[in-house]
Amino acid sequence: MTRYIFVTGGVVSSLGKGIASASLAAILEARGLKVTILKLDPYINVDPGTMSPFQHGEVFVTEDGAETDLDLGHYERFIRTTMTKRNNFTTGRVYETVLRKERRGDYLGGTVQVIPHITDEIKRRIVEGAGDADVALVEIGGTVGDIESLPFLEATRQLKVEVGSRRALFMHLTLVPYIATAGEVKTKPTQHSVKEMRSIGLQPDILVCRSEHSIDQSSRRKIALFTNVEERAVIALEDAKSIYSIPMMLHAQGLDEIIVERFGLECGPADLSEWQSVVDNEANPEHEVTIAMVGKYMELLDAYKSLIEALKHAGIRNKTKVNIRYIDSEQVYQQGVDLLKGVDAILVPGGFGERGVEGKIQTVRYARENKIPYLGICLGLQVAVIEYARHVAGMEDAHSTEFNPKSAHPVVGLITEWQDASGKTEQRDEASDLGGTMRLGAQECKLVDGSTVRECYGKAIIEERHRHRYEVNGNLVPRLEEAGLQVAGWSQDGSLVEVVEVKDHPWFVACQFHPEFKSTPRDGHPLFEGFVRAALENAGGK
């Protein structure tokens, strides 16, 4: 039977519920338990797929093609369980399901209400998402007290009553601020946050107190007294230099032992040696490189969360400190490529829309002509193809139909038909809805022998995740190949270009998929590791 840990947040948002949940899950997994994590988002969007990165940050794509919250990326980086569409749902998704049932007449003419209909659907999805896991952590987005979160909190209250206190508990994250003028931490916001929880029928069993300073024993005792929480269950979580050290920090305070005792679980001690190795390698690099990341969402780096972490993982695996220089592609267009001078490698990530595209094309040209290692991802492949077509293959007005529908050389165009991973044909056109209409999720890719990417992966067939609506125009591929561009990877049916390389270049790889979604701190990712090695070689040759 699955046990449930409901994770809530108080005082302020962005406390790190996702990291705390993932870290706790990592400890429980290290004790031999089967663990999964769900994220419940209170916003009314059906999914984050059409939301601006400035609003929401990164959209994390699962193996089965769901566009989900970036917290699912944290979950996959911390535990071995692969997330699916069942691990993330929103208020919008819940209401959509309930309204569809109402239209079908499933409620037999009854009045459809938040309680019980919405809360029942939330509970159904939680139980379904938990599956056969020993422990399911359920993170509820937002802050306790928000109107949007109330149906989710009510549903979890009901679920705890239904399964019993031996199978469910509440873990509440709060902020314990440090007041510099007084020279002490203040517990009052935490007391009020718990008071807010109790007003809606929820009593936290564990408090995780976030603070930039250490929380002394007397403050923890005071918090325990005023919140009706056992003193040893008041966990202090200071700001950490590395998020990958948090499993050790929580384990040192016995958080996993509290949970195992409460649930009556039989399992071994936690083996956190892999995490200790990750932290040690991150803290003691032997080399250093600087990589330029040229994109359009540089004001909010959460838009590139998985990518930043993937570079960090590759650095850990190569015992290399990776410094990332974040450069807005519009600035490259306005100020020139001098902004790129002094870097050891260049990465152009994915993105949507025309803004900043010409700056990315200039960036690609700079990397190609100056023999600087280049990795292009998604749009980073498309701009690489456009640049090569314009400046090497003689197609001066080459462009993507996304940005210039009238181009005489549309080297990138809308995919109207493709096969999904199961071999089923999917079709789209310009009139298709924006939400959920892309080529999404894990797809097989066949790598060409002798290519750089084939050497990185060490195998001929790989599986990577996609999120795109445009693709290299197959009709113009022969002209590009004649001009020296190498197609190094094809889709499973051989119809779509997945990877391109430039032959007379030390390391120039551009892929249509998103390898960052499969990178983890313990296992890294072969493509990013190869990229960082190329950056190291370039740095050593200067």
UniProtKB/Swiss-Prot annotation:
Q: Pathway, according to UniProt?
A: Pyrimidine metabolism; CTP biosynthesis via de novo pathway; CTP from UDP: step 2/2
One biological process term from GO is: 'de novo' CTP biosynthetic process
Q: Identify the domain of life.
A: Bacteria
Q: Does the keyword tRNA-binding apply?
A: no
Q: InterPro entries recorded for this chain?
A: Class_I_gatase-like, CTP_synthase, CTP_synthase_N, GATASE, GATase1_CTP_Synthase, P-loop_NTPase
Query: MF terms per GO, please?
Result: ATP binding; CTP synthase activity; glutaminase activity; identical protein binding; metal ion binding
Keyword Membrane on this protein? no
- UniProt-annotated binding residues for L-glutamine: G351, L379, G380, L381, Q382, E402, R469
Residues that coordinate or bind UTP: S13, K186, T187, K188, P189, T190, Q191, K222
Cellular component, GO, one term: cytosol
User: One Pfam annotation, family name?
Assistant: CTP_synth_N
Annotated segments matching region Amidoligase domain: 1-265
Q: Which PROSITE patterns match?
A: GATASE_TYPE_1
Notes on how activity is controlled? Allosterically activated by GTP, when glutamine is the substrate; GTP has no effect on the reaction when ammonia is the substrate. The allosteric effector GTP functions by stabilizing the protein conformation that binds the tetrahedral intermediate(s) formed during glutamine hydrolysis. Inhibited by the product CTP, via allosteric rather than competitive inhibition.
Ligand binding (CTP): S13, D146, I147, E148, K186, T187, K188, P189, T190, Q191, K222
Residues recorded as binding Mg(2+), renumbered to this chain, are: D71, E139
What positions does the domain Glutamine amidotransferase type-1 occupy?
290-541
Q: Which residues bind ATP?
A: S14, L15, G16, K17, G18, I19, D71
Q: Which UniProt keywords apply?
A: ATP-binding, Glutamine amidotransferase, Ligase, Magnesium, Metal-binding, Nucleotide-binding, Pyrimidine biosynthesis
What the record says about family reads:
Belongs to the CTP synthase family.
Quaternary state and interactors: Homotetramer.
Q: What does this protein do?
A: Catalyzes the ATP-dependent amination of UTP to CTP with either L-glutamine or ammonia as the source of nitrogen. Regulates intracellular CTP levels through interactions with the four ribonucleotide triphosphates.
Please share what else the UniProt entry notes about this protein.
Answer: CTPSs have evolved a hybrid strategy for distinguishing between UTP and CTP. The overlapping regions of the product feedback inhibitory and substrate sites recognize a common feature in both compounds, the triphosphate moiety. To differentiate isosteric substrate and product pyrimidine rings, an additional pocket far from the expected kinase/ligase catalytic site, specifically recognizes the cytosine and ribose portions of the product inhibitor.
Q: What is this protein called?
A: CTP synthase
Annotated source species: Hahella chejuensis (strain KCTC 2396)
